[in-house]
Amino acid sequence: MIFIDACFRKPTPYTPIWLMRQAGRYLSEYKQTRTKAGSFLSLCKNVELATEVTLQPVEILDVDAAILFSDILVVPLEMGLPLEFLAGEGPKFNRTISNVSDVVNLQEGAHKRLTYVYDTLSSIRSKLPKEKALIGFCGSPWTLATYMIEGQGSKTYAKSKAMLYKEPYILKTLLETLSEELKLYLEGQIRAGANAVQIFDSWASALECEVYFEFSWKYMKDIAQYIKGKYPHIPVMLFPKGIAGYLDKIDGCFDVFGVDWGTPMALAKSYLGTKYVLQGNLEPSRLYDKESMERGIDEILKIMGKEKGHIFNLGHGMLPDLPRENAIALVQMVREKSKR
């Protein structure tokens, strides 16, 4: 698999490409399947339909990897926090974490109840062309904890930060609990057919530098080390969003570092390019205009060159109203321009 080879710095005929949120509303096929499912959560839990939407961008865009269609919040859901996705508001937990008892009362063994995820991965792998990689994923303990404490997305993370500074032992207990579940969850995904796994730290930028490494990076490193220790042939990818100022402190046992669009690729390369394969980092909005998109591709490929050590991706997820024809052109351009 070209994608897996790139994760381990092996020679590839071109720079491989996949896109975060490549299965999504910019595809009419996705919207039709989503309607069929009835709700977003129902789509995540329906093996047949989740397989269908995972495969759609592989067939339409010809990307080099499929990423499991699911949501990072299925883990706290299976830990006993009722979850709903509200139109225009996003995910919301009807019960939240505010004290040690709430953490202790979380249901153990969530990874055992996520069989619909494992079944979906097995289904995808059986239908995916053998040369295409299958990526599994989870959210970071910190990012999941913020949702569990706030109850939904937040601009200030006030409750999470209040807990961090006033009662850090509660937050650390929650982070440790999540970390242990996520190790076993990713392991289950690998056993079900995932060829690589990615940890999304969507709310990394909410924390100042030293606090970030104590309350987020530490736990991601621990999960990555667990997976690499048991499955050295499986690439582990980390995507911490918005930590351009912290790159000099990045360390750990993982393979691929995802670069968000707010971080200059040249900066990431200067700090991390010899230690990790870099993934990214086209600004998704460039896909609104084909010429702007092509300029962005050229800039990134000029920095990264045609050398080993780069996987092309967006610096964040696909937007719902991006033109599908530009997404198709993006994959074609990257493949053509990066030919060895």
UniProtKB/Swiss-Prot annotation:
Binding site for substrate: 21-25, 40, 71, 147, 202, 316
UniProt pathway annotation: Porphyrin-containing compound metabolism; protoporphyrin-IX biosynthesis; coproporphyrinogen-III from 5-aminolevulinate: step 4/4
GO biological process: protoporphyrinogen IX biosynthetic process from glutamate
Keywords linked to the UniProt accession: Cytoplasm, Decarboxylase, Lyase, Porphyrin biosynthesis
Localization, UniProt: Cytoplasm
E.C. code: 4.1.1.37
UniProt key word Transport: no
Site feature location: Transition state stabilizer: 71
PROSITE patterns in alphabetical order: UROD_1, UROD_2
Record's catalysed reaction(s): uroporphyrinogen III + 4 H(+) = coproporphyrinogen III + 4 CO2
InterPro entries reported for this sequence: UROD/MetE-like_sf (IPR038071), Uroporphyrinogen_deCO2ase_HemE (IPR006361), Uroporphyrinogen_deCOase (IPR000257)
Keyword match Cytoplasm: yes
GO molecular function: uroporphyrinogen decarboxylase activity
An example Gene Ontology CC term for this record: cytosol
Family: Belongs to the uroporphyrinogen decarboxylase family.
Assembly, per entry: Homodimer.
Free-text function comment from the UniProt entry: Catalyzes the decarboxylation of four acetate groups of uroporphyrinogen-III to yield coproporphyrinogen-III.
Name of the protein described by the UniProt record: Uroporphyrinogen decarboxylase
Originating organism: Helicobacter hepaticus (strain ATCC 51449 / 3B1)
